[in-house]
Amino acid sequence: MKKILALLLLLCFVAVPFSNVFAENEKCGDYTIEELALKLENHSLLVYKDGNITFQDEHGIQPLLIQIKKKGLKNAIAVDKVIGKAAALLMVYGKVKQVHTNIIAKDAIPVFEKYKVEYSYNEVVDYIQNMKKDGLCPMEQKVLKVNSPKKAYKIFTKKQ
């Protein structure tokens, strides 16, 4: 099953050109973006930093929050399955260098452009849906009117 998913992902890279900044087969340290994306497989987040690959398996924005707290994202390359505005703001807060995702929400793109983060994606969607797929993701709802990465980080790390 993993090989089939990896093959499908590879076909997406061949069939759908990278959007925006990344050129096909661009090297990111020791790997191309395609190679890093294939390594993501069933994980939710892959971070390539200082020659090391780290995986996170939690759902939503938790993988980003864990990575920021544990090892940081400064000058890292992140490969995430889905990126909305909340994830984009957290990635900028963590000072990520490059990002690739399969699915990106329209409102995440201006965040990366404003902060000059290199990004690529396979598909753009209007917004990130909640788990029931009947509305906006609650994390996206929290940052709907937020444009500051620092403020977004504070919102998501605030003790309830």
Task: Kindly give the residue locations of the regions a language model identified.
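Short, glycine/polar-rich helix-capping loops at beta-to-alpha or helix-loop-helix junctions
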Residues: 107-108, 130
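Conserved mixed alpha/beta catalytic, RNA-binding, or beta-rich assembly cores of soluble enzyme
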Residues: 26-102, 122-142
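Short acidic, glycine/proline-enriched helix-loop-strand junctions
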Residues: 108-122
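Positively charged n-region of N-terminal signal peptides that target proteins for export
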Residues: 1-4
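Bacterial N-terminal signal peptides
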Residues: 8-16
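Intrinsically disordered, low-complexity, charge-dense segments enriched in Lys/Arg
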Residues: 29, 46, 144-160
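Sec-dependent signal peptide cleavage junction
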Residues: 17-25
